[in-house]
Amino acid sequence: MSVKPEKPVWMSQEDYDRQYGTVGDGENKTAIVEKTTITTQSSSNVVVGEASKTSSDIGANKIQKRKRHDDFALEEKKRRERERRLREEQLKEHEIKLTAEKITNVNNLVREHYNERTYIANRTKRNQSPIIKLRNFNNAIKFMLIDKFTHTGDVVLELGCGKGGDLRKYGAAGISQFIGIDISNASIQEAHKRYQSMKNLDFQAILITGDCFGESLGVAVEPFPECRFPCDVVSTQFCLHYAFETEEKARRALLNVSKSLKVGGRFFGTIPDSEFLRYKLNKIGKDVQEPKWGNQIYSIKFSNNDYHENGNEFPSPYGQMYTFWLEDAIDNVPEYVVPFETLRSLADEYGMELILQMPFNQFFVQEIPKWVNRFSPKMREGLTRSDGKYGVEGIEKEPAAYLYTVFAFKKVREHVE
């Protein structure tokens, strides 16, 4: 008799029972309890929200400051909404080329987006972001993932390194060299500035503009002979989905990873959870031609109904495009489903063996007890929910805890082309 898998926290009990059968009386029903948080060890960790009441002795200047702050916040919200609508209109003009004719260079669209986001981010303060708790949660996930698979003295290659947001995390792991490659030249420039401004980073950083997935890495790294290949670690955070535009790009991405790693090296990262995407699509009626879901801070939209028309299966493991919008971060950029079994199969073909795959919420619950006292007080505060537990809540929970999964592979043999 087959063993039923544990119910994902984002799946309703009704859907689980329909797919796997009703839970028996003798089974442990605690599996259905939501596990995205863990209670802090003392009541002192509880963060109380700002007091909403105003006492009679608050000065007029404080009231004026609050009003100015509220006015500014309202204007910022309106500005972001205008930018989002403009981006949606621009994207609609490209959808036919992106989906049917496939002649638009998605790399250019992604590059332009992240160049633009870099300039916008330089003008805004991170702690004013409407998704600050989501950012904190994602950072915690990366801290724990990097620490788990990175060792002292390692040479690290990060594909899609962005603005170098993980440099300090790798510094804490004690690496000796960091090679970062990203398609956005503006992001690489910002990563250079970040590295130069950071103190006590005892490792060499080589930051390169290049295409990690569309061509051989040799094209990008050839002018940098100081890069110490093969590496101990290859990491890709929130970007591998771009490689699944075509089978050719996905294979090139995995070949780049394999050729860059020494035997025994680790390849790890974060990607959208294909099972969660399938779950959400299954919840939408089959007559909906452009399936879409989300909330006030994020949305995902498929431009066709191929999934339902193909019997609730993607017609191909490659090229299954959707557009993703995340408030203050992603502006309706094309992304691609990464069927995890396809990723695992490709990795195996290129000499890498799966050692970990786990949704964010489960990974967080598993690892956070080891990290409660290792995180800084500021980090712990940023992870504390309104109920005194560590995690993420409200409208930020779905795009943070449920949408993504962590993975890790180990290179066990050389790939022979």
From Swiss-Prot:
Record-annotated mRNA cap 0 methyltransferase domain positions: 129-412
Annotated catalysed reactions: a 5'-end (5'-triphosphoguanosine)-ribonucleoside in mRNA + S-adenosyl-L-methionine = a 5'-end (N(7)-methyl 5'-triphosphoguanosine)-ribonucleoside in mRNA + S-adenosyl-L-homocysteine
Recorded superkingdom: Eukaryota
Gene Ontology, cellular component aspect: cytosol; P-TEFb-cap methyltransferase complex
Single GO MF annotation: RNA binding
EC number: 2.1.1.56
One Pfam family hit: mRNA_G-N7_MeTrfase
Residues under site feature: mRNA cap binding: 163, 169, 194, 241, 335, 404
Function: Responsible for methylating the 5'-cap structure of mRNAs.
Family as reported in the entry's similarity comment: Belongs to the class I-like SAM-binding methyltransferase superfamily. mRNA cap 0 methyltransferase family.
Record-given protein name: mRNA cap guanine-N(7) methyltransferase
UniProt source species: Candida glabrata (strain ATCC 2001 / BCRC 20586 / JCM 3761 / NBRC 0622 / NRRL Y-65 / CBS 138) (Yeast)
Encoding gene (name): ABD1
